[in-house]
Amino acid sequence: MQKDETILLDPWYSYHANLLGPENLFIFDNGSKSTSVIQSLQRAGSNGATVIWEYSTRHEYRERGSMIANFIQRLDHSNPFDFYFLLDCDEFLACQTNSGISCQRRDIERVLQPCIGSRDVLLIRHKFWHNPCRMHLYSITNSSPKCFFAQGACDSLDHGYHHAKSRLGSGETITNIIYFEFHYKPYRLHRISSRQHLSCVVTDFSRRSLQAYQKKQDFNHHCAEDLLEGKFDYVRRFLDPQGWERAPALLAEFNRIGISYASLYEPKSLLPQPLQLSLLRIRQSVMHRVDELNDLLYRGARLIFRKTSWLMQRSLQPLLRMTRFGG
């Protein structure tokens, strides 16, 4: 399910349409308003993909796990597929082979062959989180693996597709399927996306409110953490040379297909890196001070309001007593 994924929808569609065929893609739109995104969805629909428009509310976004599980079950009865992958718009399907990462359909089919008809919940092996400041570099994670199903197995899904149940058994099987995940966009777009994902549960985006929501560890709490992070801290951690692995297979496939991907990365600064980071640090410090001042003013205004209300109530009490006595 996607909404207004301005820089990711076209690469996602082009890559998976080439890999799997557009007729095998089902795209759930959650009420996009962007003209370019709506046009991209219409093109995808005319090229053979199925675009589902009716789930457009915030509530439906929160309940997407059960909604998509029901959709898979209906497909199982009417138009079954061998496998069902639950992909977000920032996730790109690939596989791990003996010779490395592959983005080729024949290798993915070979990896999936032993899982045809599986009764288990199927899990991907890794996620490759991309580095938005350095092309071809990824952080590999094994935590919170995404789920997918073979035909007939889907029973239930959570919102993030990390936890699932099979209607045919209670086992889990780790496969050699992997996802490339482009969660981290250029900083400005990353903030817009995080705010959008949080808007179904938060209306106050002040620093004080975001910190309180983050501590609750509630729905999409990681988006609050993203919004609290300044650009200096954001960029600096991606420039750290430690913890990254080179994996050129996906962008090589993008080049082969003709997919533009420059917008998925932070624009290269014309300044020397040390100077760029120094300026970003100063800017971040100033912005945080402004946030603290706004928070102080907000708390001061609330205190004044409470005091004023209390004084008004006290001053009205004699008048009310006199009115009652006079009546």
Say what each PLM segment does.
Residues 271-327:
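Boundary detector for helix-to-coil junctions that initiate low-complexity/charged tails
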Residues 14-23:
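Short, acidic, metal-binding catalytic loop of nucleotide-sugar glycosyltransferases
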Residues 1-14, 31:
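Active-site beta-to-alpha loop of glycosyltransferases that engages the nucleotide-sugar donor
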Residues 22-32, 54-57:
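Short beta-strand/loop segment that forms part of the nucleotide-sugar
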Residues 37-86:
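Active-site-proximal specificity loops/subdomain of glycosyltransferases
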Residues 65-66, 95-287:
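Catalytic-site signature of metal-activated, phosphate-bearing donor transferases
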Residues 22-23, 82, 122:
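Short acidic/polar active-site loop segments enriched in Thr and Asp
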Residues 89-93:
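Acidic metal-phosphate-binding loop of nucleotide-sugar-dependent transferases
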